[in-house]
Amino acid sequence: MEEEKLTSEKEIYDITVIGGGPVGLFTAFYAGLRGISVKVIESLSELGGQPAILYPEKVIYDIPAFPAITGADLVDNLIEQLERFKDKTTICLKEEVKTFEKENAIFTITTNKGNHFSKAIIIACGNGAFAPRRLGLDDEERYADHNLFYNVHKLDQFAGKKVVICGGGDSAVDWANALDKIAESVTLVHRRDAFRAHEHSVEVLKTSHVNIMTPYVPLELKGEGDEATSLVIQKVKSEETKELSLDSLIVSFGFSTSNKNLKSWNIDYKRSSINVSPLFETSQTGVFAIGDAAEYEGKIDLIATGFGEAPTAVNQAIKYIYPERDNRVVHSTSLIK
């Protein structure tokens, strides 16, 4: 699968999937399994969504048939699975969908790079675009991506280093526990005494070698050139300060998400989720929504849930596009020889 280069040619795809995260990738695979052409439009520079960007090294335990799998491995497997249908699949990266409109049964999908054309659309963009919450300190941007990080792609890059982590949620605690095994030292800074993480993870943290600094908040970054060398922290409701020497700083304050373009998509939505029927139809005929982007009674936001929704959405889209076809579902064991 190669990234598409937009041309003036109006190539019309059967289904366009908005979102290249795990659910979007599996949707594209299942569409290929049904023998139709599919395009995936992803706003980021790589496929995989949150597991690839936010927690590639973290282990996921609730994916069927995988007792444990990292975010990166899950994404790699989904991309490998999709490779089977690379001749009928087009990937478009770094494209944000602004609007889409239907005329004569064909959707024109407008992105920041141009127009795409499709007979049906499946929205699988999760909670939308996401960006890290920052420290809000002077010189933060100067150190970002040098030795100040908002997510961890590879644990090995911190081996033998003095690491300071800011945050008190699941990610911060998980990174602290994981890095405790390979870093020279790990210091975890949180503004409250209690952590907002799973109880078991907190218990592991308390028995680790991690230096826990609570309740403290970041006050000042110090550095040389493009690298931070220390973080000054201040105790909450106190004038007391401490300066923490560091080789690497991880800011784990979570990420803010935005589905700001929903308003221009001409579909019914509530807050940042799209209202769907039991068949994952939106208020606009020919447009479907699944995964975290979709909202219905009893919805559970899990990757596994989105995987289960994908075949239904694809099959309904095919019925919409080709109502004259025999659309009985056939098992993959009969479709792939």
Curated annotation (Swiss-Prot):
GO MF annotation terms: ferredoxin-NADP+ reductase activity; flavin adenine dinucleotide binding; NADP binding
Pfam families: Pyr_redox_2
Cofactor note: Binds 1 FAD per subunit.
Gene3D superfamilies per UniProt: FAD/NAD(P)-binding domain (3.50.50.60)
Keywords tagged on the record: FAD, Flavoprotein, NADP, Oxidoreductase
SUPFAM superfamilies per UniProt: FAD/NAD(P)-binding domain (SSF51905)
Coiled coil: none
Cofactor: FAD
UniProt EC number: 1.18.1.2
InterPro entries linked: FAD/NAD-bd_sf, FAD/NAD-binding_dom, Fd--NADP_Rdtase_type_2, Ferredoxin-NADP_redctase_2
Reaction catalysis annotation: 2 reduced [2Fe-2S]-[ferredoxin] + NADP(+) + H(+) = 2 oxidized [2Fe-2S]-[ferredoxin] + NADPH
Subunit structure comment from the entry: Homodimer.
Protein name: Ferredoxin--NADP reductase
Native organism: Streptococcus mutans serotype c (strain ATCC 700610 / UA159)
